[in-house]
Amino acid sequence: MAAKQNRISEALSSFIRAESFSGIFLFFCAVSAMIVANSPFSDIYKNFWEQPFGFSFAGGFYGFSIHDWINDVLMSIFFLMVGLEIKRELLFGDLSGFQKAAFPVIGAVGGMIVPGVIYYVLNMNTPSYHGFGIPMATDIAFALGVILLLGKRVPLALKVFLVTLAVADDLGAIVVIAVFYPSPEGLHFIYLGVAAGLLILLTGINHLGVRHLGVYIGIGILLWFCVHHSGIHATIAAVALAFCIPVKPKIESKEFIQVVQQMIEIFESKDKERKNILLDTQQMSAIDEAGRDFAKVQNPLLRLEHALQPLCAFIIMPLFAFANAGVDIRAEVNFHIDHIMLGVILGLVVGKPLGILSLTFLCEKCKIASRPAGVSWSHIFGAGMLAGIGFTMSMFVSNLAFDAPQASDVSKIAILLASSIAGIVGSLYLIINYKINSRAKVKS
């Protein structure tokens, strides 16, 4: 049990480091996109993403635009990692028990409902009402990047709370995408039926003890194809696949230790007989067998998650930011399209902290759950502000919510402004709060 807890702790630490540093890189890519989109290279930037990429066969073209490859295919890999994180947290982490999960989950619910309601109230009875999902999202990479820069000014318990809240927020965002943002062409039930059959197959091979990740990835690609053509956004297939990835390793730790000890004994016995630096056949076989067992003892879920983390953090998400954050503000952008601008900014900057603080406060007063030790209400409010950094996740929802370029551009500018305000104000608030608390401790 202790070894398992250590592995989960290491996974969480690795996750925080990767997400935090990638947040800085994401910011650089977003700024670069804005600079290029407002430079003489603006047309090249826009046209590049619309270039088709694929292959031709029998008179037909099979592929997508570069923009769609990033938003539909690469982002599915990102959502696969998100799904793995959610499953890990549900089974072993801070979402694994009611007492541990209740406080951050209720905070995440408040941080989604209040921003969504604010946006909807401002835009109801307008064509832009369906953008309510935009301010509901949180960009965990940016939020953790900011909280990392604050260092010791923020207690570790608050970092864990923010990570857990963001994971729960991701789960909520996935539900919102699946339910409220289907394809405008409607649902295709034949593809949905095949997708359901593939999900049953994935669940079945998991229960049968199949641990080879290649099998799951292969079936997952077919699942992605069916969901993509069904009318539901393809990233949902990636999340469903993540929940089917096995947790148990092929061999247990005790068996692995016995095998390794046997290999070491063989290696040592043959080493005494060796007359030169070359390994003999039995020693080479022992090394090969030990190598195979190293893979077998690894948890498939954690192994895949660790493999995807750097890919998502330093390639996929920066690419997404660079491809989607470039809005030409020199053009005639109609900032008065309904109340998109106001809805997104108020939702993220005001709605997020208000929703998180109010629902967690009620949660504690009703004795459903309590705050983590060492975390004050001022900390919760500060974390709520940082949760208002929607950025990439909000932009992803914006792409689904708006087909009209004008509405999409306004929402993206609003997301960038709101995320900047939330990050700056949240950071200053937590710094000032730390200084006030430090002075109070000195006086006492």
Swiss-Prot record:
GO biological process entries: regulation of pH
Catalytic activity: Na(+)(in) + 2 H(+)(out) = Na(+)(out) + 2 H(+)(in)
UniProt membrane topology term: Multi-pass membrane protein
GO cellular component terms, semicolon-separated: plasma membrane
Residues spanning the membrane: 21-41, 64-84, 102-122, 131-151, 160-180, 185-205, 212-232, 307-327, 342-362, 377-397, 413-433
Subcellular location: Cell inner membrane
Domain of life: Bacteria
InterPro entries assigned to the protein according to its UniProt record, in alphabetical order: Na/H_antiporter_dom_sf (IPR023171), NhaA (IPR004670)
Pfam families: Na_H_antiport_1
A molecular function GO annotation: sodium:proton antiporter activity
Keywords, alphabetical: Antiport, Cell inner membrane, Cell membrane, Ion transport, Membrane, Sodium, Sodium transport, Transmembrane, Transmembrane helix, Transport
Main location per the UniProt record: membrane
Role of this protein: Na(+)/H(+) antiporter that extrudes sodium in exchange for external protons.
PANTHER family: NA(+)_H(+) ANTIPORTER NHAA, SODIUM ION/PROTON ANTIPORTER NHAA-RELATED
Family: Belongs to the NhaA Na(+)/H(+) (TC 2.A.33) antiporter family.
HAMAP family per record: NhaA
Protein name (record): Na(+)/H(+) antiporter NhaA 2
Origin species: Helicobacter hepaticus (strain ATCC 51449 / 3B1)
Lineage, opening ranks: Bacteria, Pseudomonadati, Campylobacterota, Epsilonproteobacteria, Campylobacterales
Gene encoding the protein: nhaA2
